[in-house]
Amino acid sequence: MGTMTPAQRRALYESARFARETTYNGPLGPEYTPAGTRLRLWAPTAEQAAVNLYRKGHDSPCIGTLPLQRGPQGVWSIWLPGDQHGHYYTFTVTVDGVAQETGDPYARAGGLNGLRSMIVDLARTAPAGWERDVRPVIPPARRSVWEVSVRDFSQDAASGVRPAWRGKFLAFTQTGTTLHGDGIHPTCLNYLKRLGVGYVQLMPIFDFGNVDEAKPLLRQYNWGYDPTNYNFPEGSYSTDPARGEVRVRECKEMIAALHAAGIGVIMDVVYNHMYRYENVLNNTVPDYFFRQNENGSLSNGSGCGNEFASERPMARKYMIDSLLYWAQEYHIDGFRFDLMGLYDVDTMNAARAALDALPGGRDILMYGEPWQGGGSQLHRYEANKANLAMLNERIGIFCDDTRDAIKGGCFNAREPGYVEGKPGSFWDIGGAVAAWCRSDRLPPHAPSQIVSYVSAHDNFTLWDKLLCVRYERPEFTASDPVALAQNRLAAGIYLTSFGLPFLQAGEEFARTKKGVGNSYRSSPALNRLDWARAGQYHALVDYYRGLLALRAAFPRLGTTDRHAPEALQFFSLEQPLVGWTLPAAPGDGAWWRALCVFYNPTDTSRVVPLPAGQWKLLSNGTSSSLWRGESRTYERKALLMPYSATVFGAV
């Protein structure tokens, strides 16, 4: 095609002719059989392409280079006879006379740091019983999400996890762990089963940069939002990153263990950008997979140097192929999309349709961040809050309106929210309870489209935020009774609201990062889950546990019925109190005929009127499990504790 500038390439890639002549709908990547392996690579602008063969994934010489044959739509391929399992390879792609050695964008396994791709017989990576592993059935009433990094989950020595498995996939498979082995306070998988969450959302588990898999991990740390290979797991989370099949098998073992515990697995996916511009996609088809400005320079809507061009046909195919692969090969139960606002609406809806077409695919969750990390060249409908009405109703969004209303803005550490007494914020609490279905701000198709939360891996932990609002110089490791009460109130609001409840791991035991708001590459010690705090704040853990169970006992709060929030009746109360009632849906198995809920963000007790009838106290400011016993029944009026969410059930 001749030497082209980035601006000329942009014009070419966005032309109808290029799309017509190069769009390919067939399989790409390695196709293994015992008799041989077919490799396919989409590289329509290449003049030449070859495969380089290696015996090892690192520190070994090339044992041969073979030319690939060009076919229609720019797909290059080669047949490698014989059993190729365990062999490593790269491609050399020549464009405009420049040869680049690169990994396979569709590789299913890789060597150290993912620099070489690996041919793998996936059947040999299946853990025992994998063929019987199925996605757990989690009804909407039981859906809740607990977000954690694989590394954070178990790297604390107090976790009780065997040393070789700390910070690894296999930590999720170890049962019976307790704090310092005390046999009393459960940690890790046993802790999760007791807590009662429906899903674990794993921060990026695909192969990422910024952690050198060839070096000890004692001081290395990264969240993983630096993708290098999208279709196989991160090696630093495996016990042997040099052997490509190990990371695949151990990732599957983790998923199987969570499934056996009745917990679904949601994968945090970061297709919106890649770690470096020199990557497996750009080395294969220069500038195709990433948006450019008009002058050909890179658009940077991710804030990370580049952004994925989801609207281009083969980029869209790549993203959807990858999602389908993880759903089918790894039995993933849901996907969380980082910076979802960088994808176009059509791609997100196409991904939803593709997942729906899988057996059981309609139960696979999809939700994401409906914003971008900077100005973007995506000049069509972005998958953001403004275009929520254009997204499939089973594509959800993180609701920063709910987050900020409850605890205050995330970009100003000292800005209060409702639980800290911000004047006028009670109006937004009503919107949050209804999952904004009764608001003009961002009416969703259904309440289940709203992810209700107050903390995630980004920004301050809830505990740190509460202390920053209360004190100019907080002591983050000190206990604080008022902050604990405000923490319980925050949980009491979003766990009694419509929508999909979501929490950062450790929020339920006052997790602190000592005021660090962006710990993506801070020390492992700062990021780890401090399991001693789960013991220290066991009463707070039990408060979350009780609310999660209470929510499951009143299914209407988790409903997918778009009209359900219309049944909410709000009371006219003295500001800033908020109160409401909600009848149970007919035949949904609710334990109570209706709920009556009050929020009190003040430092004094308040008396409120109750609707007619008898109301059993289910939860108050200190205990969320009163409903499990013979709790008191109230009529006409009730007393609200300071900084409290109080829940009654009609009897």
Residue ranges of predicted features:
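Glycine-rich phosphate/pyrophosphate-binding loop
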Residues: 109-158, 397-479
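C-terminal beta-strand-rich structural cap/linker in extracellular carbohydrate-active enzymes
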Residues: 43, 85-89, 630-651
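Active-site-proximal helices and loops of the catalytic beta/alpha 8
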Residues: 64-70, 218-225, 339-444, 507-546, ...
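Structural beta-strand segments of beta-rich domains
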Residues: 35-39
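Loop/helix patches that line or flank the sugar-binding groove of alpha-linked glycan CAZymes
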Residues: 444-616
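Substrate-binding/active-site clefts of carbohydrate-active enzymes
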Residues: 151-330, 336-359, 365, 376-377
